[in-house]
A protein has these predicted regions:
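Blade-edge beta-strand/turn elements of extracellular beta-propeller
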Residues: 101-102, 153-154, 205-206, 257-258, ...
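Extracellular receptor-binding modules and their adjoining Ser/Thr/Gly/Asp/Asn-rich linkers
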Residues: 1-74, 78-82, 88-95, 113-126, ...
Length: 440
């Protein structure tokens, strides 16, 4: 038996059926029906495929990655040391725990650093912001269109006609705008933001607005669709390098800022952010003296408050990135183990109230995973996989704390304990389980 429709009762409470156990089953616990017609305990597991190169090994830097939900493709952006440091992109297709790439395409024929990218789900375009070494290090942005396994680009536009660095980007799906945060080297290193509007294959910008009158870095953004706000996190170099957040409101092509909220009163590195759409919370991972930490933020109006921090890695942690897994309802944090191996690791965080707890980390690659900047981890909702791209020209696909429970395979509840390969009774739908306790 492998079809759950065979178990739907005709109207009685008598549906008790014997099954062979695939794994040890605990009395009173829910079980699934396997493809082999056996009963198995609900469980989670993590696994990673073999990393696949998207460029020449050892030559990429400033690696960034987005997921195109219209084309159902992964798009990786990087600076190619093997090709005059040009800005380059490639389209990837996930299959299982592997990924294949189309031909790499140059989007900027000059030194390209500080790359940050997002996906505009309204225009179905990628938006890539970067520092253009061929144009006085101005801040530029360009729109990409994915077709099959290739990507084409429109004409670049300036978002800051001065030296620009530490670029972060996000998409506001309420206002249908791209939001770029950056350090304006042409204006005393002030933290600055600007709003971009995609039209066709081009992008235009509103006026730049400073959110700090001194130096900032490590900018990242996430959209809060519940409050219709953008959450900006950054390292406030001008204030003892504290980890800081601000809630931004987009109106037309303008951006307004709330009051800063400090989430860590210490030198904070690698600040990043994702939004948990189940818990309706912002999740902010960061590194303190190498240790990987995270906090949960609650947006209210133009302010944000934070719960207690939790640790996901006590050793060296660098190159943090995060993305929300909407199937597993977890925020996955990727990082480089920065003490001995420099391997790539990922860990899933689960939000409860204003707290977050982290599971066991998965070593998704033995390659060196350093990258100078950028959000290099995304969630592919079509394949239900995480994807991390990194400087070693590798791209790893992995499942983290993935459950064997699906929308169609829940079988019932065990009437008693069943040893692996033994036969025992399962109370299927319409039956009554009499071994439950503590349900008053």
């Amino acid at each position: 038996m492998s079809n759950l429709s065979d178990l739907i009762p005709a109207g009685g409470g008598q549906n008790n059926t014997d099954f062979v156990a695939d794994g040890t089953i605990v009395s009173g616990k829910p079980v699934i029906l396997t493809a082999a017609g056996k009963a198995a305990p609900i469980s989670t597991s993590s696994s990673a495929g073999t990393p696949v190169s998207f460029g020449s090994v050892g030559t990429p830097d400033y690696v960034n990655v987005v997921y195109d939900t219209s084309a159902n493709k992964v798009v990786v952006f990087w600076m190619d040391y093997g090709n005059s440091q040009y800005g380059t992109a490639a389209v990837g297709t996930v299959s299982g725990t592997s990924i294949s790439f189309g031909t790499a395409v140059v989007f900027n024929s000059a030194e390209t650093t500080a790359i940050a990218a997002t996906f505009d789900s309204n225009a179905n375009k990628t938006v890539t912001a970067y520092r253009d070494g061929g144009a006085s290090n101005y801040g530029k942005a360009i729109v990409g269109t994915v077709s099959g396994t290739s990507i084409s680009f429109g004409t670049e536009a300036d978002f800051n006609a001065a030296s620009t660095t530490n670029i972060g980007i996000g998409f506001d799906s309420t206002a249908n705008k791209a939001v770029i945060a950056f350090r304006d080297d042409g204006n005393s290193d002030h933290g600055t933001a600007v709003v971009g509007t995609v039209s066709g294959t081009g992008i235009s910008f509103g006026s730049e607005t400073a959110f700090q009158t001194n130096q900032t870095s490590s900018h990242n953004l996430a959209h809060d669709p519940d409050e219709n706000k953008m959450v900006l996190v950054y390292k406030h170099d001008g204030n003892s390098s504290y980890g800081t957040a601000n809630v931004c409101t987009i109106t037309g092509t303008s951006i307004a800022f709330g009051t800063d909220s400090i989430f860590k009163t210490a030198n904070t590195d690698n600040t990043t952010v994702a939004y948990d759409t189940t818990a309706n919370k912002a999740v902010v991972p960061y590194a303190i003296s190498g240790a990987g930490k995270g906090v949960v933020g609650t947006v209210s109006g133009t302010g944000i408050t934070f719960g207690a921090e939790a640790e996901f890695n006590a050793g060296g942690s660098s190159n943090l990135a995060c993305a929300y897994n909407s199937t597993g309802n977890t925020t996955v944090v990727s990082y480089t183990e920065a003490v001995t191996t420099f391997d790539g690791f990922a860990v899933a965080g689960t939000v409860s109230g204003t707290s977050i707890s982290f599971g066991t980390a998965l070593n998704f690659t033995g390659d060196v995973t350093y990258s100078s900047s950028g959000q290099n981890t995304i969630y592919d909702p079509d394949a239900n996989k995480m994807v991390s791209a990194y400087r070693g020209a590798g791209c790893a696909v992995y499942a983290l704390d993935a459950s064997n429970l699906t929308a169609t395979n829940l079988l019932g509840v065990a009437a008693g304990a069943i040893s692996d390969t033994a036969t025992g009774t399962i109370n299927t739908w319409g039956s009554r389980n009499e071994v439950q306790t503590g349900l008053t």
